[in-house]
Amino acid sequence: MIHHLKGQLIEKNPTYVVIECNGIGYYINISLHTFSLIPDSEAVSVYTHLQVKEDSHTLYGFAEKSEREIFRLLISVSGVGTSTARMMLSSLQPREVTEAIASEDVATIQSVKGIGAKTAQRVILDLKDKVLKVLGDDEVFVSQSNTNKEEALSALEILGYNRRQAGKVVEKILKEDPESTVESIIKMALKKL
């Protein structure tokens, strides 16, 4: 297993990088998240995951250890391959993926191209406990945020608003200010609906 590679950056693209280590150029598949974090300088370091198949050895690179761990968790789910896991980490920030799994947010996971309702539910079912262990202290924040979101959505639904439309507005509000109280979420949502 190759844990990480440190060397000279030869080529950098949104889907891969080439890093030269001791005269050997390694082609490493990356996510958009990693692409945005890798500096354009010559000396770089990436954490790697090596996938060995009958016909190929493929390297996947990550700017952060946490992203690699999420990738490994995702590919452990039946029906989620390396391409789908990389697509998830390109479409969503690693933190958004873990929060969506921890809060059982099927819609967020399903928003990734190539993931249907069944796969999204399987990802949540298989990984929720593992993700909560990884999150540790942040688990409280996730569940609190999810509770505030659910309470605000229920209140807006009682007021006669469509749950789906209200959900989109509440998501935007929570992205701007994740620590919003239920009352402030409802007030801001009423202004935007």
UniProtKB/Swiss-Prot annotation:
Q: Which region ranges are annotated with the description Flexible linker? A: 143-145
In residue numbers, the region (Domain II) covers: 64-142
Q: Which UniProt keywords apply?
A: Cytoplasm, DNA damage, DNA recombination, DNA repair, DNA-binding
Q: Where is this region: Domain I?
A: 1-63
Q: Name one GO cellular component term.
A: Holliday junction resolvase complex
Source domain of life is Bacteria
Please provide an example of a Pfam family that matches this protein in its UniProt record: RuvA_C
Region of interest called Domain III, as start-end residue ranges on this chain: 145-193
Look up keyword Amino-acid biosynthesis and say if it applies: no
Q: Where in the cell is it found?
A: Cytoplasm
Q: Which GO terms describe its molecular function?
A: ATP binding; four-way junction DNA binding; four-way junction helicase activity
Q: Which SUPFAM superfamilies match?
A: DNA helicase RuvA subunit, C-terminal domain, Nucleic acid-binding proteins, RuvA domain 2-like
Q: Which GO terms describe its biological process?
A: DNA recombination; DNA repair
What quaternary structure, including any partners, is listed in this protein's UniProt entry? Answer: Homotetramer. Forms an RuvA(8)-RuvB(12)-Holliday junction (HJ) complex. HJ DNA is sandwiched between 2 RuvA tetramers; dsDNA enters through RuvA and exits via RuvB. An RuvB hexamer assembles on each DNA strand where it exits the tetramer. Each RuvB hexamer is contacted by two RuvA subunits (via domain III) on 2 adjacent RuvB subunits; this complex drives branch migration. In the full resolvosome a probable DNA-RuvA(4)-RuvB(12)-RuvC(2) complex forms which resolves the HJ.
Q: What is known of its domains?
A: Has three domains with a flexible linker between the domains II and III and assumes an 'L' shape. Domain III is highly mobile and contacts RuvB.
- Family listed: Belongs to the RuvA family.
What this protein is reported to do is described as:
The RuvA-RuvB-RuvC complex processes Holliday junction (HJ) DNA during genetic recombination and DNA repair, while the RuvA-RuvB complex plays an important role in the rescue of blocked DNA replication forks via replication fork reversal (RFR). RuvA specifically binds to HJ cruciform DNA, conferring on it an open structure. The RuvB hexamer acts as an ATP-dependent pump, pulling dsDNA into and through the RuvAB complex. HJ branch migration allows RuvC to scan DNA until it finds its consensus sequence, where it cleaves and resolves the cruciform DNA.
Question: What is the protein name stated in its UniProt record?
Answer: Holliday junction branch migration complex subunit RuvA
Q: Which gene encodes it?
A: ruvA
